[in-house]
Regions:
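Catalytic center-proximal scaffold of phosphoryl-transfer enzymes
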Residues: 12-358
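N-terminal juxtadomain amphipathic helix
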Residues: 1-10
Length: 358
């Protein structure tokens, strides 16, 4: 237990209906047969395992509770409870809380997890081996707009947010279903407005239009800026000063509600640019198409005035947090181990651990 080893003498009896010996107290406490770790200790080591870089680190921290556990014990219980969490059906609806009107913000993105490839264990001297495999973990952050505040020093802060993170290679359709289910738990059906913020990945936009048809879709401002930067670099190469001089005014126009002028500038540059090289023209055609497709998702001045986020920093921050645990030096995961720990991480971050430890 969290208080060390506790030995109890308890009565047991023979059950005629069960035709075996039973331990009523063990059953009343919810302990399985031969279980030697209390539910509270199990919950603590599992939660700690989602925060520190290794199972060995969990064992070291447990000693601060005067509790001697091994990293093998931690690993075993993380995998046991993570597997149980992965088998859970739809979670119960969250309490509604305040009845005042609110807006809901949904941000989606992905990051790459490092797993053991099909040739894991084969000598690195063989050049054709696939020892390491990279697969995308799709993630989302959901929060009420009114929960976004600023500190005294002006730093942005979200008071209460919820996350979705699915196993590597989860299909976009299944990820979209998971995001919508979590959004419904957090008030999607009651929200006055819904904003979906994301980068330009095609699968994200298909998902958003399919699952959140009535939402306001917003292209992450920093990704829009990166695409303008790509045009500037195609035109002026390594001349950073000329690139900044060309890109700067267009970024300012985006910020000041002149997004149509930005799109028109790019279109004119493509149509009148007779001296463009084939490589420059290829980049321009790609970026003009990009901004034409997203010209209804660029109203940054309007959204900023209403307090609506124009960037997907919250979900990118989530990706970095997960990578600090799941992609540190020397970590090469098997799929079950990664999936189980990821599932526990989501439960703890969403304060849903009571479905496993009540």
């Amino acid at each position: 237990t969290v208080a060390g080893i506790v030995r109890l003498r308890v009565p047991i009896g023979y059950s005629q209906p069960k035709r075996g010996w039973v331990n009523p107290l063990r059953e009343a406490w919810g302990l399985k047969a031969y279980q030697q770790v209390s539910p509270e200790l199990q919950a603590r080591v599992c939660q700690t395992a989602t925060l520190v870089p290794s199972y060995e680190g969990v064992a070291e921290l447990a000693r601060l509770w005067d509790c001697e556990v091994s990293d093998d014990l931690v690993h075993r219980h993380v995998q046991e409870m993570g597997a149980k969490a992965s088998r859970l059906g739809p979670l119960p609806a969250a309490p509604w809380g305040s009845s005042t009107e609110f807006s809901l913000v949904i941000m989606m993105d992905g990051w790459m997890a490092r797993e053991r490839g099909p040739d894991w264990g084969v000598s690195w001297r063989r050049k054709t081996t696939e020892r390491i495999a990279w697969h995308e973990v799709k993630s989302a952050v959901i929060y009420r707009l009114e929960q976004a505040v600023r500190t005294g020093k002006g730093r942005g802060l979200i008071l209460e947010k919820y996350i979705v993170a699915t196993a590597p290679d989860t299909a976009p359709v299944d990820f979209g279903q998971a995001v919508r289910a979590e959004a419904m738990r957090r008030g999607l059906g009651r929200a006055k407005r819904v904003y979906v913020v994301m980068d330009g990945a095609v699968w994200l936009w298909h998902l958003a239009r399919d699952r959140f048809a009535e939402a306001v879709l917003i292209l992450d401002f920093h990704h829009a800026r990166e695409h303008l930067q790509a045009v500037g670099q195609a035109l002026y190469g390594e001349d950073d000063q000329r690139v900044r001089q060309w890109v700067g005014p267009l970024i300012t126009q985006l910020q000041r509600g002149k997004e149509k002028r930005v799109v028109k500038t790019l279109e004119e540059l493509l149509s009148k640019g007779r001296r463009l090289s084939s490589a420059q023209r290829k980049v321009l055609q790609r970026e003009v198409g990009y901004f034409q497709e997203h010209q209804d998702h660029l109203h940054y001045q309007r959204w900023k005035r209403s307090g609506t986020p124009c960037g997907s920093g919250a979900v990118e921050s989530l990706g970095l947090q997960l990578q600090r645990r799941l992609r540190t030096c020397g970590q090469f995961w098997k799929r079950p181990g990664l999936t189980h720990l990821l599932r526990l991480t989501v439960l703890f971050k969403n304060h849903d651990q009571n479905v496993l430890w009540n």
